[in-house]
Amino acid sequence: YSYLAFTQLRQMDVAIALKPMKILEVMEKVGNVPTTITCAVKGRYARADLGRWAQRYGIGFNPSDMRANDGEACSRAVLSASTPQDAADITLALYQAIWSEGKTLANSADVVAAVSAHGIDASGVVARIDSPATVAKLKANTDEAAERGVFGSPTTFVGVAMFFGNDRLDFVREELARLEEAA
């Protein structure tokens, strides 16, 4: 659902501060059980639901085996970006590789290859993806997410207001409009 939400957030013409995190660790910290993983019936439903949302948004949907992907390496790649725009471009490239192109990104080398395949200069990613500073930033983001009450992904903050889920984007739009009117 994060892939779906991200494609729509990019169209909202607002600054997006991406904060990659280790979602399973966040869920564990706050006592949330990932039921789409632990309940096979719900997992099958979610797969069909994701396909419906992708069709509605007009985006590709050919997911790889999620359990085979290195989510931490993907998160570290985004954190390796030099600018917020680079982070957004890397995020989209990785989401498309995994969710639309069916590619398995099992390690840092696969992640770098996916970034490069989308026409993005991956030299910064190569230099920083496995650095101690990037690993520490991912841990800090994970801790911050749990402290802010995040329990799943996608979670979007507009100011201090938190919205969870791809299906809450209308509320995100409304909050953005409310803040714009108040300014």
Question: What is the predicted function of each stretch?
Answer:
Residues 1-19, 93-183:
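C-terminal cap of thioredoxin/glutaredoxin-like
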Residues 1-101:
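Structural alpha/beta surface segment adjacent to cysteine/selenocysteine redox centers
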